[in-house]
Structure formats: structure tokens, C-alpha cells
Amino acid sequence: MNTVKTVRELRAAVARARGEGKRIGFVPTMGNLHSGHAALVTKAAQRADFVVASIFVNPLQFGANEDLDKYPRTLAADQERLLQAGCNLLFAPAVEEMYPDGMSVQTRVSVPQLSEGLCGASRPGHFEGVATVVSKLFNMVQPDLAVFGEKDFQQLAVIRAMVRDLNMPIQIIGEPTVRADDGLALSSRNGYLTPEQRTAAPALYRTLQHIAAGIGRGQRDFAALVAEGQAQLSAAGFRPDYLEVRHAVSLRPALIDDRDLVVIAAAYLGNTRLIDNLYLHLEEKTA
């Protein structure tokens, strides 16, 4: 696996692979990789002949009081994990390579509606930063397909909409969330948790399961289910940011006749903000 740091080197390497008739897969990351990221690369390797991954901690998607400076940078370990997962090329640019004229004059990509609410409410500008950097990376790599984790459910919806609306010829593949044995979704931010917080953390997924089970039994008072869930989270030591039942495609608030739903949440455990979601498809209407 080669590692390149400039757009020129990246494009030359991808052009060679494409010249050999290879299908290009792409996995953008911010590094500090875990088994969830490895699953994305493995999926890309199954669907493509040449896999490009990127590691770039994107300042444009971090708010003023967020963890940009303390976000872990673990390049050597990340390179080994990518190699084991089947990555062929790593693009690891500096901020100056991605934003040569500075971020203040950078053209932005904004996906309305889907970027609003949920994580967009508590992290204003976040999804504009995500859409902008992913759009730039897509133009740099020009992949046939790209793989994103379903744990970042709203992000995946934003990327799908951007690709559709801007007519990008890229297949977007969602990969199911990878979880620890106790149900906690794998996340780079789990490393911020104290041992006690790590023990409490699986309550987030259990709460989503509780709400989904109620819906599966035919309960349609979503507000009551959410209130129960918020009480569960608070009892487990969380400070809920949001906990909602939404339509899984449009992300609007769920209606009682919707068949495709997502129970989606963000909550703080100490100073660490965890997110998770649970998709459910209802086969038939419940009276």
C-alpha cells in the first residue's frame, strides 16, 4: 500500500489503476481507525479492484468548541490497519493541500433540509463542512463507488443527496454499524470515555432497541416512547442531545403510516458525545 500526500500523486496513482481497467473504490476517514473503518475498506475491496482511503481531519466540519485539536492522529497504526483490510492507496494530505487558499474563501457545498436538525442543530455548519470536503475528495479520486458507515446516519443521507443532486457518477454504499460485544457502536471518540463511562455507554443502544421494540409491537405514540428513552438515558448517566424517531429516507419526523423508520440519538456521557441509530422496516400496517 502506497501513501501519498498531494493531489498530483493521488491522481497519478488512480490514473494508473484506471488505465489497467480497475474499478476504483473509496473510503474517506479522519483516521484513528478501528474495526468499523476496516469493515468499510473490506466492503470497498469486495466491490472494487483498487481501494483508495483518505485520512484527513477536516477543520471545516469542527465547531469552535469541538475536539479538533485533541482528535487523535495515529497514522502509523492506521496505515497498518488499512493494509490489513485491503487498501491499495492512502491519501493523507495536509490542511494546506486541501485548502490551499485558506478555508475562509473555500467554495462550500451545502445540502439543505437533510443537514438541518438532529446533529445539524447542535453542530451548525458541520454538514456543510462534511459535504464540502467529501465533494473535494470525490473530485480528486473520482471513484466508481464510495463506502460510508451507517452509524453516521445523517451524514450518509447528506452524502447520498449531494451525489444525487449534483449528478456525481458515484455509487454510495452504506455499511452496517460495527459494534462491540456489549452493543456499543465503535467510534474513535469511545477512546475519550473513562472505564466507568465505557461500562455505562451501551445503554445508548439498549435505549434505541427499547424504542424500536415498542414500535415493532405496534406502538405509534412516538413521543411517549421517546420520553421513556430519554428517562432511560438520564438514569444511565447520559445527557441526551436528541432522541427521535424519523423517516429513514427524508429524516423528517416519523408519521404513523411510515414503513421505514430510524430511531436516532446523540447523547453526552461526561464530555464525550456519542451517536447511534437503529433502522427498522415495518412490513405491514398496524391498526
UniProtKB/Swiss-Prot annotation:
GO terms for cellular component: cytosol
Main location: cytoplasm
UniProt xrefs under InterPro entries: Pantoate_ligase, Pantoate_ligase_C, Rossmann-like_a/b/a_fold
UniProt-recorded Gene Ontology molecular function terms: ATP binding; pantoate-beta-alanine ligase activity
E.C. no: 6.3.2.1
Localization annotation: Cytoplasm
PANTHER family: CYTIDYLATE KINASE/PANTOATE-BETA-ALANINE LIGASE (PTHR21299), PANTOATE--BETA-ALANINE LIGASE (PTHR21299:SF1)
Function: Catalyzes the condensation of pantoate with beta-alanine in an ATP-dependent reaction via a pantoyl-adenylate intermediate.
Additional observations: The reaction proceeds by a bi uni uni bi ping pong mechanism.
Quaternary data: Homodimer.
Protein name: Pantothenate synthetase
Organism listed in the record: Pseudomonas putida (strain GB-1)
Classification lineage: Bacteria, Pseudomonadati, Pseudomonadota, Gammaproteobacteria, Pseudomonadales
